[in-house]
Amino acid sequence: MQTKTNYRKKPPFFILVWAIPLIIFCLYAIYQHYITGLPYYGQGRIPMKQATALSVPGFSFINQEGKTIDSTTIKNKIWVADFFFTSCPSICPKMTEHLKTVQAAFNNSDDVKILSFSVDPERDNPKKLEQYAHTHSIDSNSWSLLTGSKKDLYSYARHGLFIDATDGDGGVEDFIHSDRFVLIDREGHIRGYYDGTSDMDTKLLIADIKTLL
């Protein structure tokens, strides 16, 4: 009589592909929250100690409703910044979807805001931004799409949030296209940079915001 040999089944490959990043994410979140705390960032995106941390400079731009949004609007708030343009066919739609996930995660909190700065302000006037907000179901109470002087927007990107390391003066030929999300705490310190096209980085961003709340 033949006996059947029992072989231990190996887990499907797709389960491993899904599980390993999740485990890494959980370990990272625990490490950040309970052990190290979030770092502070300065020029060149270099981590620094809290005592030497820089505060982001002030700003004043116009949102999708034609209202002025400035530093006082987000005083004592935790906020996320990114740079986009409404006609962007590549990374911007993905980044917007990820920011919608962030918005939904803190929908009931007035302590978290999102600011999306246009890098194409000549085309992205308030009306165009309002159309974009409507198309993507963006709640203006917590998420502002900003436009203004290209020179001022580009200067803030480079010298305020250190989003781009290239030189430029905000002129006609100057262009910034970044996939970064930037996390700023209540005191105006930069606490993190994230790949705005990454599902995993978006989850990390949400976890880090919860750490700051």
Regions found by a protein language model. Give the residues of each.
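N-terminal targeting signals for export/organelle localization
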Residues: 1-58
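Short extracytoplasmic
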Residues: 46-80
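Extracytoplasmic
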Residues: 54-56, 74-78, 109-112, 124, ...
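Short active-site neighborhood of thiol/selenol oxidoreductases, capturing the structured segment around
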Residues: 69-99, 115
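Structural microenvironment flanking redox-active thiols in thiol-disulfide oxidoreductases
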Residues: 96-156
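Structural micro-motif
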Residues: 143, 154, 158-166, 175-182
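Thiol-/selenol-based redox modules, centered on thioredoxin-like
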Residues: 167-213
